[in-house]
Amino acid sequence: MCGIAGIISFQKNLTEEELIRMRDSMIHRGPDGSGLWISENKKVILGHRRLSILDLSEKANQPMSNEDGSLQIVFNGEIFNYQDIRLELEKRGHIFKTDHSDTEVIIHSYEEWGFSCVEKFRGMFAFAIWDNNKNLLWIVRDRIGIKPIYWTKCNNKFLFASEIKALFSNPEIKKEVNTQSISDFLSILTVPAPRTMFKNINKLKAGNMMIINDKGDIKIEKYWDIATFLNNPINDITETEAIKETEKIINNAVKLRLISDVPLGITFSGGVDSTLITAFMKKNNINDIKALTIDYNIKSKYSEIEVARKISKQIGFNLQEKTINENDFALGIEEYTNIQNDYPAGDPNTILMYLISKRVKELGLTVILVGEGGDEIGGYPYYLKINDEFKYLNLFNSLPQFLKNSLYNISPLKAKKFLGFGIGDTVISRTHINGFTEEEKNKILLENSYDSSYNIISKLMNEITTEGKDLFLRKVLNVEYKNRLPQLILPRVDYPTMANSIEARVPFLDHKLVEFSARLPFNIKMKDREAKYILKNILSNYISKDLLYRKKVGFGMLLTNFLNFTVPKWIQNELLNKTNNPIYYFINKNSINKLMYLHTKKLCYGYKLWILYSLKKFLDYHIVDN
């Protein structure tokens, strides 16, 4: 895991100092070393910050070249099946200078297979290869979007980096907040790629590659699409076959992600996902499992620390526990936002992951396995709920207009809240509107000339056209994989872990598992309306039924409970601060006062207040440059 950056100039010569500023703004992503390469004509420069995970030798440093120096690569991530690919390349006559660097495997793969080599890679990655013979730069992002990559063009230059802050370290890049992105953030807690929170700063979409030539022409292509698999369901598979194949792929995915030359562990919540990963770690002979769980220093029915302890005894591993309180959380916000400020921390679990990874670092670990992606693979409980809602919304849309009006008149508030997610002939999943609805935004935003954030969801849902009773859920999964995961869930893993120089690996987002699961029918994945039916069936071989079939709340439920019923004074004070408060450039201050008032009436507006608070912290950092 590392930080990468680069510049191509189409006119003036480049200096090393330009790249060093970008590279070293991301020192947290790679504290173990740094490298730089500049072309003979001074028109191309690449930089790298290294976090040493595989092949700790100096020979594995980056930027790395091929044998004749015609190719240069900078790479962030891991290719977990690099050993198999290396064997194939060696049989084809390739000679390697490193002992076991996956970076060198990428560059030789490009030599052998060109752009199609990416189809062989099983892992998480964002890399850039400069091909001196063809005078082009090739940038690739992994299929699911686990690793980020950003780019911009300015003053006859093309710049890219692992983080937006690296781009802004170049004084030529103007920082201007994108107000449409603020509107989208308020609804979906993120911004759909290729947009970011800033004008003219772009994020390469997951499963995409881009080619930039020495004239400045840019070509972006999609090399992988989850919709291909969602639109091609397997209808003739049995339950036994589905369970057996899922178990086989998960076991292999975990096994591959145990390859490391540095200590590794796992974040453990006691839920199905992290428990299953831990069980397979044990199965693959990791006997000294270092697992970390977290608890809150508040009295709550949502605490699952006792459950986590029982599971650790049944599987057989030592559980490291960390308890945090309100002050820890407040301090974590300040520490995190001083390191990472590309996006607002709209999901408070971002801060939780920062605190967890900080403790992971204290334990001497460099790599952790995490359970993200298990919900999408297994079938999350709310999928059942939104599938039911889909039926009701479709029924509502089919009614004559006078009946629709009658329903609105009977209970206008509830009707608007629920039925507002039927847009013309299209019904969207309201579960993807985690924040403010369009109607709510119209009341709080000072300007209302933004495109509806619902259109983002609607467009993605319309990509799925397969027939059958699973249609709506397949549409929902397309949104999950193309928006919620790469733009919200995975950044809340990558950013806070990398802020502590920790590499997070995501076994449930192994693309082979994602592809297979996406094609499975939901009557098997969620048989008898049991969420994660297949995963629980597999896990039943490792833990007792009373622990397996309990109601799961997860790390985040305690945090939601914490926000809804306490809303710390520091959140209130910052939002209501009238002195140079940048949020008032966009949000009506009276609406914030109203939310505060409603929250005091026990109406649970804590999460929405957090969204506004995180936006305020983001604007505090950036608005000075507008």
Label the predicted regions:
Residues 238-242, 246, 304, 344, ...:
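Conserved acidic
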Residues 376-404:
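A mobile, often basic/glycine-rich helix-loop segment
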Residues 1-4, 21, 95, 116, ...:
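Adenosyl-5′-phosphate
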Residues 1-341, 353, 540-541, 546, ...:
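Cysteine-centered catalytic environments shared across enzyme families
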Residues 396-418:
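Alpha-helical "lid/cap" subdomains adjacent to substrate-binding clefts that gate access
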Residues 330-349, 445, 449, 460:
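Mobile, glycine- and charge-enriched loop segments
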Residues 365-381:
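Short acidic/histidine-rich active-site segments
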Residues 334-338, 383-386, 562-564:
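Short low-complexity, flexible loop/linker segments enriched in glycine and/or proline
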